Amino acid sequence: MGNADLRSLAALSDVSFDDLGGSVVAVDAHNWLYRYLTTTVKFTSESKYTTSNGEEVANLIGVVQGLPKFFEHDMTPVFVFDGAVTDLKDDEVEKRREQRQKYESELEAAREAGDSTRVAKLDSRTQRLTDTIVDTTRDLLELLDVPIVDAPAEGEGQASVMARRGDVDYVGTEDYDALLFGAPMTLRQITSKGDPELMDFAATLEHHDLTWEQLVDAAILMGTDFNEGISGIGPKTAVKDLHEHGDLYTVLAARGEHIDHADRIRDLFLDPAATDDYEIPDSIEPDIDAARTFVTDQWEVDADEVARGFERIDDSVVQTGLDRWA
């Protein structure tokens, strides 16, 4: 999920969706889905996001509600899905699993007590991306002709490499780790109602007089998904130490500290596993009727819940009048 402390280092500015027309955005699919599941559609009534068999379908509502924003502004979304979990992340994954189990126990108790406020809060904390959520999301995206890329490891790393190659214009994610992966321009808050926030990699480095390697070193000192940080080191101290000592290893030596697998963690950000097995299409032709049938008939989503979203997708295909949208 990244280190939120990076926000204080990031060069951020507001940008209007109206200024993003014609751009291609590599969306961190798991991050995008998680945001919708925990903040956007998770708080509708339970009957609207589960089937009669108890299968969760909030992700499908999220896709139908979230894609129009791209289409209406003539933006091409490319959804990048995570691959294998890096072994260095195993401890973090286990920690989150244990925390989720704790919340699930508390959630059950809150339900038994009839505490709806507590239930709503804990419901989002117990959210996880099941195989069904991922598979049905992919199926719906394919029906809507939205490009999909399968990353060999971190989806965010793959998206950032695509941006550095010039194959896409932006990375779309809430995580600040996109900076560490070297994404030139990142759009945050793309699931929010308003305009997104632009995170500028080059401006971040320039503002703090850091190299890319030093920015990664700063993050490692603070702590990443792959390691615990050094106690007492936040953004300001990390930058100060790097200006004084030059790199991660010299800082650690000066402080008498050690971080396991520091070389590997650096490489995970500076040279992430990535594939070139993808295509960015010149045109997208969503099969809206098939997508609607998939969502409402096969997965039992209330037709009224997604009617406006499909209408907006249909309208945007007509209104753009450009080759990208057939």
From Swiss-Prot:
<keyword id="KW-0479">Metal-binding</keyword>
<keyword id="KW-0540">Nuclease</keyword>
<feature type="region of interest" description="I-domain">
    <location>
        <begin position="118"/>
        <end position="246"/>
    </location>
</feature>
<dbReference type="GO" id="GO:0003677">
    <property type="term" value="F:DNA binding"/>
</dbReference>
<dbReference type="GO" id="GO:0006281">
    <property type="term" value="P:DNA repair"/>
</dbReference>
<keyword id="KW-0460">Magnesium</keyword>
<comment type="similarity">
    <text>Belongs to the XPG/RAD2 endonuclease family. FEN1 subfamily.</text>
</comment>
<keyword id="KW-0227">DNA damage</keyword>
<protein>
    <recommendedName>
        <fullName>Flap endonuclease 1</fullName>
        <ecNumber>3.1.-.-</ecNumber>
    </recommendedName>
</protein>
<feature type="binding site">
    <location>
        <position position="225"/>
    </location>
    <ligand>
        <name>Mg(2+) 2</name>
    </ligand>
</feature>
<feature type="binding site">
    <location>
        <position position="175"/>
    </location>
    <ligand>
        <name>Mg(2+) 2</name>
    </ligand>
</feature>
<dbReference type="InterPro" id="IPR019973">
    <property type="entry name" value="Flap_endonuc_arc"/>
</dbReference>
<dbReference type="InterPro" id="IPR002421">
    <property type="entry name" value="5-3_exonuclease"/>
</dbReference>
<feature type="binding site">
    <location>
        <position position="154"/>
    </location>
    <ligand>
        <name>Mg(2+) 1</name>
    </ligand>
</feature>
<feature type="region of interest" description="Interaction with PCNA">
    <location>
        <begin position="318"/>
        <end position="326"/>
    </location>
</feature>
<keyword id="KW-0255">Endonuclease</keyword>
<dbReference type="InterPro" id="IPR036279">
    <property type="entry name" value="5-3_exonuclease_C_sf"/>
</dbReference>
<dbReference type="InterPro" id="IPR023426">
    <property type="entry name" value="Flap_endonuc"/>
</dbReference>
<keyword id="KW-0234">DNA repair</keyword>
<dbReference type="InterPro" id="IPR029060">
    <property type="entry name" value="PIN-like_dom_sf"/>
</dbReference>
<dbReference type="GO" id="GO:0008409">
    <property type="term" value="F:5'-3' exonuclease activity"/>
</dbReference>
<dbReference type="Pfam" id="PF00867">
    <property type="entry name" value="XPG_I"/>
</dbReference>
<feature type="binding site">
    <location>
        <position position="156"/>
    </location>
    <ligand>
        <name>Mg(2+) 1</name>
    </ligand>
</feature>
<dbReference type="GO" id="GO:0000287">
    <property type="term" value="F:magnesium ion binding"/>
</dbReference>
<keyword id="KW-0235">DNA replication</keyword>
<comment type="function">
    <text>Structure-specific nuclease with 5'-flap endonuclease and 5'-3' exonuclease activities involved in DNA replication and repair. During DNA replication, cleaves the 5'-overhanging flap structure that is generated by displacement synthesis when DNA polymerase encounters the 5'-end of a downstream Okazaki fragment. Binds the unpaired 3'-DNA end and kinks the DNA to facilitate 5' cleavage specificity. Cleaves one nucleotide into the double-stranded DNA from the junction in flap DNA, leaving a nick for ligation. Also involved in the base excision repair (BER) pathway.</text>
</comment>
<feature type="binding site">
    <location>
        <position position="28"/>
    </location>
    <ligand>
        <name>Mg(2+) 1</name>
    </ligand>
</feature>
<dbReference type="GO" id="GO:0043137">
    <property type="term" value="P:DNA replication, removal of RNA primer"/>
</dbReference>
<feature type="binding site">
    <location>
        <position position="82"/>
    </location>
    <ligand>
        <name>Mg(2+) 1</name>
    </ligand>
</feature>
<feature type="binding site">
    <location>
        <position position="177"/>
    </location>
    <ligand>
        <name>Mg(2+) 2</name>
    </ligand>
</feature>
<dbReference type="InterPro" id="IPR006084">
    <property type="entry name" value="XPG/Rad2"/>
</dbReference>
<dbReference type="InterPro" id="IPR008918">
    <property type="entry name" value="HhH2"/>
</dbReference>
<dbReference type="GO" id="GO:0017108">
    <property type="term" value="F:5'-flap endonuclease activity"/>
</dbReference>
<comment type="subunit">
    <text>Interacts with PCNA. PCNA stimulates the nuclease activity without altering cleavage specificity.</text>
</comment>
<keyword id="KW-0378">Hydrolase</keyword>
<feature type="region of interest" description="N-domain">
    <location>
        <begin position="1"/>
        <end position="100"/>
    </location>
</feature>
<keyword id="KW-0269">Exonuclease</keyword>
<dbReference type="InterPro" id="IPR006086">
    <property type="entry name" value="XPG-I_dom"/>
</dbReference>
<dbReference type="InterPro" id="IPR006085">
    <property type="entry name" value="XPG_DNA_repair_N"/>
</dbReference>
<dbReference type="Pfam" id="PF00752">
    <property type="entry name" value="XPG_N"/>
</dbReference>
